[in-house]
Amino acid sequence: APLVRFAAIGHAYLAWASAHPTHFRVISERPLIDYESSDTLARSNAAIRDVMQQLLAEAFGEQRDARSQALARIAARALVYGLARMAVDGHFPEWGIAQQPTGQTLADTLDFFMGLLGADPGPMRAAGPAPTAPSRARRPR
């Protein structure tokens, strides 16, 4: 099933980040590794995005348009990246489930998200304008 394979990518990423926290920290700081100049990194990232896009297209077919599939891909990426960052930075003792190892919390959270992803794609927020991202420009003091 495509969503099972899609979830497997996320589970593998979380396992890798947990097993290699220093490597995760280095590659997640793109300015430190000059990401823009690395053809290998760009190709690798494009390849995994293409696989994720294909799996979502297989999973949803006509149920979700290309934009909805892109939003699902971004949400999944943000979730696994955020979970990996939280694990590597040691946030789970305060945010995790009591008496449960971090690895289990990571897996359970991703599985929870995948369950939501496979559910009705209707909007989850009230109608109205979408929130805007904060500006990165520095404000004068």
What label would you give each PLM region?
Residues E29:
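Phosphate-coordinating loops and pocket residues in cytosolic domains that bind phosphorylated ligands
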Residues G10, L14, R49, Q53, ...:
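Hydrophobic core segments within long, regular secondary-structure runs in both alpha-
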Residues L32:
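Positions that flank functional sites
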Residues A1-H23, N45-A47, A66, A72-A76:
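Hydrophobic alpha-helical connector segments
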Residues Y35-A42, A46, A59-D111, D120-R141:
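Hydrophobic/aromatic-rich alpha-helical bundle segments in the mid-to-C-terminal region
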